[in-house]
UniProtKB/Swiss-Prot annotation:
BP terms from Gene Ontology: galactose metabolic process
Annotated GO MF terms: ATP binding; galactokinase activity; magnesium ion binding
Top EC category: transferase
Reactions catalysed: alpha-D-galactose + ATP = alpha-D-galactose 1-phosphate + ADP + H(+)
Organism expressing this protein natively: Thermotoga neapolitana
EC numbers: 2.7.1.6
PROSITE patterns tied to this protein: GALACTOKINASE, GHMP_KINASES_ATP
Family, similarity comment: Belongs to the GHMP kinase family. GalK subfamily.
NCBIfam families: gal_kin, PRK03817.1
Listed name of the protein: Galactokinase
Subcellular location: Cytoplasm
Length: 350
């Protein structure tokens, strides 16, 4: 059996998903493709890496196989027996660009196992299994947005997701006359070893200091009670949630000018308050600001490298791409990669 699971891009709502916040992602037309078949032992093959790993029983290797192994462990923890299988994976998703290749791999694995063994679990349960794999087995304390979007993606729609209640709404993504591009800074971030988990701890500390259970209970007034660093982190989360709500409204009204401005202000907040951007992504956003037809841009993903989402009028980005590429190369001696992004449906058999 063969399945595919999409990556995702988050229009806005960065570092809110693990803080019970709002997010506005959509599944993208770049996928992890996965084939599953019975086997005498566990065999995991990656076409992209041209590598095969065999194991008698599931174990953690601190490698790409952990995403698959973690999913199998999560099934077993729930009492499902997963006998040895061969899983072959290929992908046209760029790694580390902020498109969440890891969640796509987890979702593809979870869906394939569920169908192959006849468990036929509902998608939401598979989302929870995939997330558990990343949090408990891989060791990255991610929110639920990435796996959720890979599962529930719908072509020509973004997902307005409340990560506290998991209530969601499909918002039409009518891009006629506009386009979304991803600029990959080609500065790589290893999430588990970066500041990502530290930001999570800081956010937990905010709640502890304020005596609150969730960020949804935190008010602007509460910020005054916090020491400087924690105040900045909390301010970003509160204001980013507001930006998501405004962005949903803008999308519904087809107001891409407003959406673009919200992207720029999101980046400023990620840079100055949450402090997860880096020199390279700041350079890209600053370069794009004020250019004709460029409506908005911001860093996407965990931060410290990765990608920049760019919202523009159709054709406007194409006109300045080379200039941006040259300026970036001159400054950092690194080549940029560009991806035009379109929406896609969620995980499915092929």
């Amino acid at each position: 059996m063969r399945v595919k699971a999409p990556g995702r891009i988050n229009i806005i709502g960065e570092h809110t998903d693990y803080n019970d916040g709002y997010v506005l992602p959509f599944a993208v037309n770049r996928f992890v493709f996965l084939t599953i078949e019975d086997s005498g032992k566990f065999v995991f093959h990656s076409e992209n890496m041209n590598e095969t790993v065999e194991m008698e029983k599931i174990e953690k290797l601190n490698r790409w196989t952990d995403y698959i192994s973690g999913v199998i462990k999560a099934f077993e923890k729930r009492g499902y027996k997963v006998s040895p299988v061969k899983i072959s994976v290929s992908s046209n998703l760029p790694m580390g660009a902020g498109l969440s290749s890891s969640a796509a791999l987890e979702m593809a694995t979870a869906y394939a196992i569920s169908e192959h063994f006849g468990f036929h679990l509902p998608k939401l349960e598979l989302v929870k299994i995939a997330r558990e794999a990343e949090v408990e087995f891989v060791g990255v304390r991610c929110g639920i947005m990435d796996q959720f979007t890979s599962a529930f993606g719908k072509k020509d729609h973004a997902i307005f997701l409340d990560t506290m209640t998991l209530e969601y709404e499909y918002v039409p993504l009518k891009l006629e006359g506009y386009e979304i591009n991803l600029v990959d800074s080609n500065v790589k971030h290893e999430l588990s070893s970066s500041e990502y988990n530290k930001r999570r701890q800081e956010c937990e500390e905010v709640l502890r200091v304020l005596g609150k259970r969730s960020f949804r209970e935190v008010t602007k007034e509460d910020l005054k009670k916090l020491p400087d660093v924690l105040k900045k982190r909390a301010q970003h989360v509160l204001e980013e949630n507001e930006r998501v709500l405004k962005s949903v409204q803008a999308l519904k009204e087809g107001d891409f000018e407003t959406l673009g401005r919200l992207l720029f202000s999101s980046h400023e907040s990620l840079r100055d308050l949450y402090e997860v951007s880096c020199e390279q992504t700041d350079f890209i956003v600053d370069f794009l600001k004020g250019r004709e037809g460029i409506l908005g841009a911001r860093m996407v993903g965990g931060g410290f490298g990765g990608g920049v989402i760019v919202l523009s009028k159709k054709g406007a980005f194409e006109k300045i791409k080379e200039e941006l590429k040259n300026a970036y190369r001159d400054r950092f001696k690194i080549e940029l990669t560009f991806h035009e992004i379109e929406s896609a449906d969620g995980v499915q058999k092929i």
